[in-house]
Amino acid sequence: AAECGEQRSVALGAAGMDGDVPFSPGWADWTQEEREHEARRLYEQAGYSPERPLRTEIRFNTSENHKKMALAVASMWKQQLGVVTTLVNEEFRVFMQNREQRTVTEVFRAGWISDYNDPYSFLEMFRTGHGRNDFGYSNSTFDALLDQIGTERVRARRERLMFEAERMLMSDHVIIPVYTYVTKRLVSPQLKGWQNNVMDHHPTRHMYKLKLRAAAAPKAAEAPPPAEPSVPADEERQQ
């Protein structure tokens, strides 16, 4: 993912969205060694060990990038914890069917591109019974927060409510954020009216193209006019 410019993510929302109050879990500031130590402690606390490893699977729809990501995750889990992971690659239609029907309850890949410039677009998917809630997440306190966000008109209070909702979601460990998508655009310097934005919306009615003038060719140096022929003094007197 890093090869394509994607940005590392430790929470749900996309940075830069209107009304976003960035949430960062406490471990985000830990060193890699501290994270690995805590992961091993929690792994053992859950009853797993090298002799009794966790066995799980990661499902992903067909894509070379998704495959690379799944391989990397499985490798790190194996190296640090001893987790035995089976990778399952499925055609998109089958993958979505298994995900939506929750016939499989192991780890699966998921991604979302917001419909509008508001963090609520990400949060609402986790409401109990929501059509996009393939995770099966259900938390009445979280649902109540979403209700408050939907009716709150004071911007600062609404932002705080969204922050609390994201904090709750991350505390419940519903998802493991990996990276945030980015868009890559090559824009001509002649194109004006283009404005980079988090939604990647670019109405052409606001754009225009400058016509660059061709550089004028340098003029040839003008030679001075020929000098008048000199007349001898004797001839000048005779004239």
Task: Go through the PLM ranges and name each one.
Residues G5, W27-R35, N61-M69, L87, ...:
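Extracytoplasmic/periplasmic, Sec-exported soluble proteins
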Residues M76-R127:
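Periplasmic binding protein-like
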Residues Q45-T62, F108-G111, R153-P189:
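Bilobed periplasmic-binding protein-like "clamshell/Venus-flytrap" ligand-binding domains
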Residues A2-Q45, S63-K68:
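Structural transition elements
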Residues C4-R8, M17, T62-H66, F92-V94, ...:
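Solvent-exposed loop/turn segments at secondary-structure junctions
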